[in-house]
Amino acid sequence: MVLSHLRFLILLITLLPRASLSENLSHPNAAAAGPDLRNRPFVVVWNMPTANCQKRHNVHLDLQDFGIVENQRQRFQGQNMTIFYRNRLGNYPYISHDGREVNGGIPQLGDLASHLSLVEVQLDVLLRPGFSGVGVIDWEEWLPLWENNFGSKMEYRRLSKQLVRQERLDLSEQDVKLLAQQEFEESARMFMEETLRLVVRRRPRGFWGFYGFPSCYNKNKRKRGRCHSGTKQKNDRLSWLWAQSTALYPSIYLPQRLAGSTDAALMIRHRLLEALRVASTWRHGNSNNQAIPVLPYARLAFTHTLNFLNETDLEHTIGESVSLGAAGVVLWGEMKFAKSKKQCVLLRDYIHTVLGPFIQTLRAGASRCSLQLCYSHGRCARRRPNSGRSLSSAPVSVSHKDTDSGSSKYFQQHFRCRCYSGWTGTWCQRKMVGRGQDKS
């Protein structure tokens, strides 16, 4: 096993770009100063492969000017933000688009021990021991609940039933389906749960979770944004996943058809509320102290397009997130945002004129509310989720004093506090001592 790890490490080092290794391995024992999600009202993290804008097209995006957290040289993977796709972490079993059964194809036929061994080696190569950034696992080929694998994912059900038939010729078709479901869900759970357990154990300061979880299943236009019936029950069945997660990363991407529509805010709101419910119900390590942070994945353009969101659409996505009490957002995008100098210039201008100022205003409102309402020991969240009240709408005095009575009254009337770890009380005014006790 040691020899195989060594061989893989040598191979990986030869394949990785030299600059990437320089960042990751030059100071292997150094603690990375990732985004401080535990003690900041709202964090915006950049997860877009835009390094080529500077490297190839000499277009600088100036993300730090607007307080956006990025990796060194805007790399897609780094010490502040890293995302692992299906072929970048271990031996994830899946069926390729051309029908190949990769690493066994279905979870039941995957080699979990080999997978976990490889994950451990990859973590040691790519992330410093002190990694404290956003860590996302993006596995979308199959879903851990049997009934959610429909459409193109039905192949996982078919192969699971085929496997049972080969091993149990005596079973009826109904029993085949039941056993196939049981075996699939147990194996899917093992791959996801043990992978998460391992990365949290090896890099405990990171914020680890699976992209797209929890889901709300609310794409149906007739439901006015409400989650699909049975959503809570489905997500409750994934309690094992939430118990191992140290952050949640639901998706709040916006389709073009909802541009400028209040239905967009409703759809995003219900997704966030379900994620916040899950975060407050299952807390990592069974801690009774603090809900795990929720950082929804957002796009600065409509889904499958390069059409940027305007301020109204940003309010319906990022604005909803901060006003409902999310710890932050992760901004994601594809390579095509940096495909040419023209596109990089468009992106830079959008950041400078729309996105950046919008984020600055939101973060300022979140910080003011945290200071005035929560003694800077918590983040603010709407008292009534459907009120539509925004943290950025609080009145600001001419003198810009933090003690402005107008904004304090607004915050007290429309928001409440979600305390950071170690603090308690209605306004997060009491420091906790020991486990679950507070110091009055």
At which residue positions do the language-model features occur?
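Alpha-helical scaffolding within the catalytic cores
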Residues: 67-69, 119-122, 226-239, 270-281, ...
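N-terminal signal peptide
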Residues: 2-40
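Extracellular cysteine-rich, disulfide-stabilized repeat modules
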Residues: 380, 409, 413-422
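Non-catalytic scaffold segments within catalytic domains of secreted glycoside hydrolases
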Residues: 210-239, 255-261, 266, 303-326
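Disulfide-braced loops of extracellular cysteine-rich modules
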Residues: 367-377
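Aromatic- and acid-rich polysaccharide-binding/catalytic face
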Residues: 79-94, 141, 146-149, 153-179, ...
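Glycoside hydrolase catalytic-domain groove-lining segments
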Residues: 237, 243, 252-301
